[in-house]
């Protein structure tokens, strides 16, 4: 029997879990091709913070090594960002010109960091915190620079601040709210957490809005200016002010999106040949960012595929 061609765009935790579930059900049904925008096999993004802090290595957080893909007959194309979906010819095209035809297409493009729309947000030294490349950039910067500013006092921002402090940087966290983790903690608990982190040497600017990132003409960030006029030095600025579903590819192909790629209860998009799982998908008005519901999506999607 001729195998059905399944192409997956994205090589993260939700997408690869879908493949694992699919292989459990029937390992011979699909001819699978995976495009990964990063030059790495699937790894655990949740553990990037221990890597930043020097508690784990990149190798230790890999979930599916290259041998796993080969053993399961999966064609893995790393460092290939897909830039086009041709829904008529049923094929995807990557930035380097490589392409693959599909009978079924699985979009697992994840999310992208929200970069504040302020002057200087494209300067060298201004990064999000989402992947191995971001983590490595922070580790490299900590070796040669001193001052880090983390924008965002949520969990991700505090993990970045803690890791950078452990790497020896002088760290300031800037947060819009009156206290840290305001969605998870009340004021009292937030202030207790702040005190514990201040005891580790991390500084805080709460109820503060970032107005501009400055470079003094060098092309690299050197300072942060706030809405009250204060300026502090910054060799590194980490944007940890939230994420957005990565829908750019789907939208360019005319697939309906609204704060995520719109999917039904079987994770099918408005194009019946195309599915979406993970942080890029919007199911009944919700784009999930936690692992447990994303793994449930993977199971449902695999069963329907």
Please tell me what each predicted stretch does.
Residues 3-5, 79, 144-147, 207:
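Phosphate-coordination loops involved in phosphoryl transfer and adenosine-cofactor binding
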Residues 31, 76-94, 100, 167-264:
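A Rossmann-like FAD-binding core segment of flavoenzymes
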Residues 2-75, 163-184:
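Beta1-alpha1 glycine-rich phosphate/pyrophosphate-binding loop at the start
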Residues 122-144, 215-225, 229-303:
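FAD-site-proximal beta/loop scaffold in flavoenzymes
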Residues 109-167, 263:
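Glycine-rich dinucleotide-binding loop and its adjacent helix/turn
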Residues 67-120:
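A conserved beta-strand/loop capping segment in the N-terminal third of enzymes
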Residues 13-16, 39, 111-113, 133, ...:
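Residue-level detector of alpha-helix initiation sites
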Residues 9, 100-110, 151, 232-242, ...:
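Short hydrophobic core segments
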């Amino acid at each position: 029997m001729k195998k059905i061609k399944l192409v997956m765009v994205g090589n993260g935790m939700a997408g690869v879990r879908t493949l694992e579930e699919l292989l459990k059900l029937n390992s011979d049904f699909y001819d699978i091709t995976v495009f990964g925008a990063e030059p790495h096999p699937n790894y655990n993004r949740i553990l990037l913070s221990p890597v930043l802090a020097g508690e784990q290595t990149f190798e230790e957080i890999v979930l599916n090594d290259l041998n796993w893909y080969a053993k399961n007959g999966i064609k893995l194309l790393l460092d290939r960002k897909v830039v086009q979906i041709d829904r008529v010819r049923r094929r995807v095209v990557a930035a380097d010109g490589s392409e693959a035809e599909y009978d079924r297409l699985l979009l697992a493009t994840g999310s992208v960091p929200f970069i504040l729309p302020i002057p200087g947000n494209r300067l060298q030294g201004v990064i999000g915190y989402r992947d191995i490349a971001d983590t490595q950039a922070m580790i490299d910067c900590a070796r040669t620079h001193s001052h880090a500013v983390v924008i965002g006092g949520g969990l991700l921002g505090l993990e970045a601040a803690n890791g950078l402090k452990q790497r020896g940087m002088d760290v300031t966290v800037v947060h819009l709210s009156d206290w840290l983790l305001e969605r998870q903690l009340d004021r009292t608990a937030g202030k207790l957490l702040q005190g514990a982190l201040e005891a580790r040497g991390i500084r805080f600017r709460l109820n503060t809005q970032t107005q501009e990132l400055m470079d003094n003409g060098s092309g690299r960030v050197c300072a942060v200016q706030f809405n009250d006029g204060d300026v502090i030095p910054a060799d590194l600025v980490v944007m940890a002010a939230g994420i957005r579903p990565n829908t750019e590819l789907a939208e360019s192909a005319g697939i309906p999106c609204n704060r995520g790629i719109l999917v039904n209860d079987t994770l099918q998009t408005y194009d019946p040949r195309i599915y979406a799982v993970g942080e890029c998908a919007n199911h009944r008005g919700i784009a999930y960012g936690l692992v447990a519901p994303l793994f449930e999506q993977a199971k449902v999607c695999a069963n329907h595929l």
